[in-house]
Amino acid sequence: MKDVYIVDAVRTPIGRYNGALAGLRPDDLAAHAIRELLARTPDLDPARIEDVYFGNANGAGEDNRNVGRMAALLAGLPTSVPGVTVNRLCASGLEAVIQAARAIALGDASIAVAGGVESMTRAPYVLPKSDRAFPAGHTELYSTTLGWRMVNPRMDPQWTVPLGESAELIADKHRIGRDQQDEFALASHRKAAQAQAAGAFDGEIAPVPLPQRKGDPVVLGADECVRADASLAAMAKLKPSFRPSGGTVTAGNASPLNDGAAALLLVDEEGLAATGREPLARVSASGVSAIDPQYFGLAPVEAVHRALAKAGKGFGDLDVLELNEAFAAQVLGCVAEWPEFDPAVLNPQGGAIALGHPLGASGARLAGTVAHQLARRGSGVGVATLCIGVGQGLALVLER
């Protein structure tokens, strides 16, 4: 097996729903990330890229069936460079990184681009087709922004429980109160705001120019959802989103809806020489898991255990663990099931509650964020992990 390195990782700023990135198609967001990634490695001939792996969760609209290939072409890569789109829901971007790393480790490729993209703002509405030419009655219209659609009636209802209700079930299981969740969310915003102020994201963000009707483009250079002014008092005023009576999950302690893209350059030793650069990190191991879907948010517990075991590491070896913050209850539930884990290394720059969670992009964003943190440290071990709808977890171990 070959060693696999992450040479660089870039991402767009994460836009809020109907925010600054609302006017940009997802394939254009993805192309921007790829274009900026390669611009930072000018010694690399783009024709040497052997595949582009891109994660995308919704895929019902302008993602255009195979956004990996479309984005590669829009980014100006040679037509000889293939592209593929992968879907593991919220972990699609991390799945793309893992698939690219696996291909390189096996010798099937030397240089690959991996990433993910989602525009939750531009996700379309869809109509199911009738099995009759002229159906009578009403037809249901589905939003593809988030949640289940056209679920098979044979599925056990607990397998497609709304994700927010699943977070409530996790809170019930681990007795995680509203105050704990709000305090965690506040900490996420504070850490993210501090990281922004310190320039911690500058090395990974590729600012996006936004065309205006008149005058020069406006440039978006920072994540839109971070609230430096967040407070427990403001969060306490929010009503429960999923259980009107006695619920603890709110818009304040859950991740928002977002738009964004991320891309990473992965290589073997030969490919590394072609870039003329020092890598950010080395890919060490990955792990995937599945559990009862109604507790989907706890699936990273086993995924991280499996990934660390493959890497020959333990929780005590970790310098950073980036766990996607779909819900505060879900993160706190995972931490409760890792008694040997030190929460001090958890999401040191804030997480998705503050930064945002553009589904298919988030896993690639997390991998890039871990890689950049390890590079700034000069050495260390990091993990990127996410929970996934329908009860799955995915984790990646990086080392430097």
What positions do the PLM features span?
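Active-site-proximal alpha-helical scaffold in enzymes
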Residues: 87-118, 171-200, 263-270, 358-379, ...
